Amino acid sequence: AEGLESERNYIKGQAHFYRAFAYFTMVQMYGGRYKAEGDNTQLGVVIRNDNSTEPRARASVEEVYTQINEDIDLAIQLLGATEEKRTNKSHIDLHVARGLKARILLTQGKWLEAAEMAKLVVDLSGAKLQDDTYTTLNDRFSDQSNTEWLWGSNPLLQQAPNLTHFHGYMSNEIISYNGNTPRAIYNKLYDKISDTDVRKGIWFPRATDPNTLPRPIRAECNSKAYANYMANKFIVSDPTTKGGRDVPFMRLPEMM
């Protein structure tokens, strides 16, 4: 391919990242669990890394993870050798690639290597914890400008009209499919959360009691309903605006 080597590295590095991410996702969904103790001959998924269409047998889990690691290692090498800078957190850079590598190592039971890779992300990515991530009522978990986000989608509002987007299903604030069925946490799981954990304030165990404060934010629609343990996690600044909002795929706290 023509072009500057830095540009080629940037494009090719992202391509290898996406293939690693795709196989990593698929083998966890459709293949056997990776066993850290070895003998990963259980069925994984079909490996197809060439331009072909003929039927192929499923590869073993070990073979799939070998392919995954080859791709993500090459992605890290190429993205580390480019001078190109991403313009949006929906794009891939070296730190996101290292974050995925940390996830892969963790899944393979390689704890120390995973921790070392994650530490590189924490130390070098420039991402920082944001004090109001769990307390703000403006764009909570829906805005990639949050300094904790390493990677996330950034759709245009017109790309997801009406209710065909993640927040249309998950946000209790947007006029959406869950107007009558608010998204909530399992009460026994809620009880396991420490009272000193700031995230516990995202849920409302007595939401159906109008006299219990604070009250959860609900969409301004005729069908709005309340349910105990409902959530105010995916909050948007303008719930009346139709269309998709940003969705986090990788965040700094995951690496800590």
Segment roles from a protein language model:
Residues 1-17, 25-253:
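Structured, solvent-exposed acidic/aromatic patches
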